[in-house]
Regions:
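Preference for long, amphipathic alpha-helical scaffolds in soluble/luminal domains
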Residues: 1-530
């Protein structure tokens, strides 16, 4: 894209090298960077982007893989956008411009009433007022309409001008849109199509943001989860009894990052779009440390966070990520984009987010919250799958959802002998690997059933934490898991990172291999009174 726009990017060579190095032997690129079979979308876009830079041998292998691919060839609108730069045969799917003018109250009613539109209205999914949708749509709509050679009428020009104004108003202080890479790249492209020059201050700031997201090895991160990571670090420090003075700066950062609405976003700059998961974790971290660290404004921040979460409970009893009553799902996974487009734009209640909110409410002993907690617990029971576990949206995946739910049920004082709780515990125990650890393959995210994989320190830690919190102390289970962690620990105290521990498009969170083993080991140490 930057080549097309004529923009000089100082990390360009590193990015090119990184992409080439991650090509599979068969010529494809996978959904993740390691141990991943070929993915049509990623292979198509990688080969198109690198045609000028790859050797003929590598390019030929990629083209042959694409020609012989027999699977689903559906492309999401952002992939279409990037491909349309060089290919005239690619049309960008985008909804009608009038959708942005539909009153928000009407849009919300579609989600609350669970309206299903006929498939002929494929764009109808964009009526749902998801935080993702609202931020991702305008660049695509602008580019798609300007690339069409048809004449722009008065109404279309007016609607495009409204979208342009919206883009200019929603750029964050760090230069991004939505604090993530894709909407930022899309907006740079849209501004270019609107006639903005590369030296325009808004484009310059956006490019600086992308540069900061790009590692020195050329890997472009989708985002930085500064609030999420810092909250996890606070809880790991607290569990391991790290000096309170070391935690104060972390706490001050979390306090500064709180939005005016009372919630937290995943990054400090995205003040207009707090989410329930980060709000729950930030509030939980502040409460856990409040007995040891007292900073002005801390109690007020906790209360505002709780109040925000209480207002965001869906009518079904659970919590989604960004919105209230935006949509709903059946028990289990959300169908991935390559099976049924549009579901990833929805924001229904999910087990992992609901669990984190419940854990926060339980830890804070919220006054008069019994009705809210019971409503959430009923939803979790409905969402539980036949094998005993839960599907988690923001981690990988069935292990993640199940462990987070069990930890939350323990925190709110649920009876661990109830059958639905025991079924979940039994499932986790049953899938322990012979090496003592736990692991799940990234393809679970796309599967209706869990796909167990090789053990990782992240997933092993999730299970150990939840089992210990549920009162499981069988040495054959817990000690075997702890032995796995200790065997994996390196000389410098760190642990190897899993090839993937997070989801949506499966990704790796580098901090997970530090904070979760630290929490698990610290809990075990306290149990053994070492």
């Amino acid at each position: 894209m930057l080549d097309y726009l004529g923009i000089q990017y100082k990390k360009k060579n590193a990015v090119i090298k990184w992409i080439i190095e991650h090509q599979n032997e068969d010529g494809s690129w996978g959904a993740i960077t390691e141990r991943s079979k070929g993915n049509y979308r990623n292979t198509l876009i990688s080969s198109e982007a690198l045609k000028m830079y790859m050797s003929s041998k590598h390019l030929e292998k990629a083209e042959n893989w694409i020609k012989t691919y027999q699977g689903n060839k559906w492309l999401d609108p952002y992939t279409q956008m990037f491909l349309s730069i060089k290919r005239k045969d690619i049309e960008i799917f985008s909804p009608p411009l009038f959708i942005n003018s539909v009153p928000l109250k009407i849009c919300k009613s579609f989600g609350k009433l669970h309206v299903n539109f006929p498939s002929i209205f494929s764009w109808s999914i964009f009526l749902y007022p998801s935080g993702w949708t609202r931020n991702a749509l305008p660049p695509l709509q602008i580019i798609a309409n300007l690339k069409k050679k048809s004449r722009l009428g008065f109404i279309k020009k007016y609607l495009l001008k409204r979208l342009e104004d919206r883009l200019l108003k929603t750029q964050l202080k760090n230069g991004s849109w939505f604090d993530t890479a894709l909407p930022t790249m899309g907006t740079i492209y849209a501004l270019h199509e609107l006639g903005y020059r590369n030296n325009d201050v808004r484009i310059v700031k956006a490019l600086k943001f992308l540069d900061e997201l790009t590692d020195t090895n050329g890997h472009l991160n989708r985002f930085r989860l500064t609030v999420w990571d810092t909250s996890l670090a606070i809880m790991a420090f607290r569990e391991s009894d790290i000096s309170d003075s070391d935690i104060k700066n972390c706490v001050k950062f979390i306090l500064r990052a709180q939005t005016k609405k009372g919630g937290w976003a995943f990054g400090m700059y995205n003040q207009n779009l707090p989410d329930n998961d980060d709000t729950a974790l930030a509030t939980l971290a502040l409460r856990k440390i409040s007995g040891n660290v007292q900073i002005k404004g801390m109690e007020g921040a906790i209360l505002r966070g709780i109040k925000y979460l209480l207002t965001m409970q869906n009518d079904d009893g659970g919590w989604g990520a960004f919105d209230k009553n935006q949509s709903y799902k059946k028990p289990g996974r959300i169908p991935p984009y390559h099976e049924e487009y549009g579901h990833e734009l929805k924001d229904p209640s999910t087990a992992d987010v609901t669990a984190h909110v419940l854990q926060t409410l339980g830890e804070n002993k919220v006054y008069n919250s019994e009705k809210i907690i019971k409503k959430a617990t009923r939803w979790l029971k409905r969402d539980q799958l036949s094998f005993g576990g839960w599907w988690g949206r923001w981690g990988l995946c069935y292990i993640y959802g199940t462990t987070q739910v069990l930890s939350s049920l323990s925190t709110i004082g649920e009876d661990m002998n109830k059958s639905y709780v025991k079924n979940a515990i039994d499932w986790l125990i049953d899938i322990q690997n012979d090496d003592g650890g736990w692991g799940e393959h990234y393809s679970s995210y796309y599967s209706e059933k869990p796909i167990i994989g090789e053990s990782t320190v992240e997933q092993t830690s999730w299970v150990l934490i939840s089992l210990m919190e549920c009162g499981i102390d069988d040495p054959k289970i817990i000690e075997k898991g702890m032995d796995f962690l200790l065997e994996k620990q390196k000389g410098d105290g760190s642990f190897p990172k899993a090839y993937t521990a997070a989801a949506i498009d499966p990704g790796r969170y580098d901090l997970y291999s530090l904070v979760f083993p630290l929490i698990a080991l610290s809990k075990y140490k306290k149990r053994c009174k070492i």
